[in-house]
């Protein structure tokens, strides 16, 4: 039982550290407007945050 608890705690700590190191792109996930403006700046119609936990900026096709 102790082994399972220790493994669970280590997995939780590892996941927490990994989540903190993720670099979100172009304002995602907290500033979808920044993603939209980025997409407009590269001559797309706009964009939105998508993917796991909305970490990726996706631009609309023309």
UniProtKB/Swiss-Prot annotation:
Tissue expression per record: Low expression in both venom and non-venom glands (hemolymph).
GO molecular function term, any single one: toxin activity
Alphabetical list of InterPro entries matching this protein: Defensin_invertebrate/fungal, Scorpion_toxin-like_sf
SUPFAM superfamilies linked: Scorpion toxin-like
Record key words, sorted: Antibiotic, Antimicrobial, Calcium-activated potassium channel impairing toxin, Defensin, Disulfide bond, Immunity, Innate immunity, Ion channel impairing toxin, Potassium channel impairing toxin, Secreted, Signal, Toxin, Voltage-gated potassium channel impairing toxin
Pfam entry (one): Defensin_2
Signal peptide: 1-24
Disulfide cysteine pairs (residue numbers): 28-49, 35-57, 39-59
Location in the cell: Secreted
Gene3D superfamilies per record: Knottin, scorpion toxin-like
Record-level GO cellular component terms: extracellular region
Biological process according to GO: defense response to bacterium; innate immune response
Reported function: Antibacterial peptide active against Gram-positive bacteria (including S.aureus ATCC25923 (MIC=2.5 uM), M.luteus AB93113 (MIC=2.5 uM), and the antibiotic-resistant S.epidermidis PRSE P1389 (MIC=1.25 uM)), but not against Gram-negative bacteria (including E.coli and P.aeruginosa). Also blocks the currents of Kv1.1/KCNA1 (57% inhibition), Kv1.2/KCNA2 (27.5% inhibition), Kv1.3/KCNA3 (IC(50)=23.4 nM, 84.3% inhibition), KCa3.1/KCNN4/IK (15% inhibition), KCa2.3/KCNN3/SK3 (87.5% inhibition) and Kv11.1/KCNH2/ERG1 (30.4% inhibition) channels (tested at 1 uM).
Family, as annotated: Belongs to the invertebrate defensin family. Type 2 subfamily.
Protein name as catalogued: Defensin BmKDfsin3
């Amino acid at each position: 039982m102790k082994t399972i608890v220790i493994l669970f705690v280590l997995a939780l700590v590892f996941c927490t550290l990994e989540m903190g190191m993720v670099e979100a792109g172009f304002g995602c996930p907290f500033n979808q407007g920044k993603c939209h403006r980025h997409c407009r700046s590269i001559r797309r119609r706009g964009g939105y945050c998508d993917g796991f936990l909305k970490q990726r900026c996706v631009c609309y096709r023309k």
